[in-house]
């Protein structure tokens, strides 16, 4: 009888221990789900704030009465939206190297300025020139650059901010070119190139970064084609959108 009672007690204790482990695991899972849901909610709020930064920049660019005029030279402008702190910049695509129009030598120079070795830059340039020379469809999205021989993830990350598909220029407009491009291609300084008086064109890139009080950050990069209209039509068309 005592042996049976001992076995029964062990079974009860084992059951209680198992239930405790299950309940502990369930509680931990619920806490993890709650943290993930809270982070997702805050990240969505930060992303919406970043989108608001894009809208504010577009409004300033399109409104000819806006003073001071928002220059498309890549400078970072601090803004506030509700509780979020924003950092927004506008860049003209005219100041970037057009992959579909640039010369082979210019592409090599820019790739090397971004850290590529000479041989790596040559492979990249030859692959792009061969594609364009054979009558294939020109690059339609910047991400296609990743597929070319000689391209690495590190090199792509360095080159992407300095290249475009929408300027149509054989060389970047020095008035809007980055210091890296001006140095690599021997372009004149922004002051000598016209600076604030230069035409930024109709294709702009907007980079918006939002940070909430809790530290959650979200970023948004978009390229838009401006099409000012006095009617109800949207005054711009999105060419590229990356969160």
PLM region spans:
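N-terminal leader/signal peptides at the extreme start of proteins
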Residues: 1-5
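Compositionally biased linear targeting/interaction segments
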Residues: 7-243
């Amino acid at each position: 009888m005592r042996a049976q009672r001992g076995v029964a007690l062990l079974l009860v204790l084992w059951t209680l221990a198992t239930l405790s482990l299950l309940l502990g695991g369930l509680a931990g899972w619920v806490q993890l789900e709650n943290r993930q849901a809270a982070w997702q909610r805050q990240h969505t709020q930060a992303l919406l704030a970043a989108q608001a930064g894009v809208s504010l920049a577009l409004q300033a660019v399109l409104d000819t009465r806006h003073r001071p005029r928002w220059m498309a030279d890549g400078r970072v402008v601090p803004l506030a939206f509700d509780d979020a702190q924003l950092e927004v910049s506008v860049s003209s695509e005219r100041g970037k190297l057009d992959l579909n129009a640039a010369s082979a030598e210019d592409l090599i120079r820019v790739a090397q300025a971004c850290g590529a070795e000479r041989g790596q830059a040559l492979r990249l340039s030859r692959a792009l020139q061969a594609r364009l020379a054979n009558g294939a469809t020109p690059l339609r999205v910047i991400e296609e650059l990743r597929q070319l021989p000689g391209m690495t993830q590190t090199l792509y990350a360095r080159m992407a901010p300095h290249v475009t598909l929408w300027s149509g220029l054989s060389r970047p407009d020095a008035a809007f070119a980055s210091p890296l491009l001006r140095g690599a291609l021997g372009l004149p300084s922004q002051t000598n190139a016209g600076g604030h008086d230069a035409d930024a064109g109709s294709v702009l890139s907007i980079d918006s970064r939002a940070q909430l009080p809790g530290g959650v950050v979200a970023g948004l990069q978009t390229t838009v084609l401006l099409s000012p209209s006095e009617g109800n039509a949207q005054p711009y068309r999105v060419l590229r959108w990356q969160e």
